[in-house]
């Protein structure tokens, strides 16, 4: 049985996604790629709490959580100098204020996720 190569450092990730099915699939993909899911959040409040209480290396942010912009979470991550990636089903960019940040358009394949994470974590 072939095993996926492990990231140089087993990075810990925060998943911020309001759709439970997408969250589950994303967590499975991350585990398959050798990453650790440090925490999951389904709302802005849960995500902000996770940014304060959880140790992680990178966050994956759904740009739209229950009709609300994920901007407060992105702002908190910038303040703590934590890297993040947007995922969205709406357009090619996560948020206008953060258009320079990587964005994966849903649905995305595991190879695109792997490449994006390696680039952001400097392990590619």
Could you describe each region identified by the protein language model?
Residues 1-12, 109-124:
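Non-catalytic signal-transmission and effector/linker regions of two-component phosphorelay proteins
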Residues 17:
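Conserved acidic carboxylate
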Residues 20-39:
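Two-component/phosphorelay signaling modules centered on CheY-like receiver
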Residues 40-58:
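Acidic, metal-coordinating helix/loop segments flanking the phosphotransfer/catalytic sites
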Residues 62:
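Active-site residues of response regulator receiver
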Residues 68-82:
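Short amphipathic alpha-helix used as the core "switch/output" element in two-component signaling
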Residues 87-88:
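Hydrophobic/aromatic residues positioned on beta-strands within the core alpha/beta folds
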Residues 106:
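A Lys-centered signature of the CheY-like receiver
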């Amino acid at each position: 049985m072939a095993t996926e190569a492990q990231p140089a450092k087993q990075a810990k990730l925060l998943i911020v996604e309001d759709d439970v099915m997408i969250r589950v699939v994303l967590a499975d993909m991350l585990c398959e790629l050798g990453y650790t899911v440090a925490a999951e959040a389904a709302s802005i409040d849960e995500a902000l709490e996770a940014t304060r209480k959880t140790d992680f290396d990178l966050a994956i942010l759904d740009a739209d959580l229950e009709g609300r912009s994920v901007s407060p979470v992105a702002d908190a991550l910038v303040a703590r100098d934590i890297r993040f990636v947007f995922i969205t089903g709406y357009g090619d960019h996560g948020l206008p204020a953060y258009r320079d940040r990587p964005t994966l358009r849903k649905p995305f394949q595991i190879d695109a996720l792997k490449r994006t994470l390696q680039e952001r974590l400097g392990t590619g």
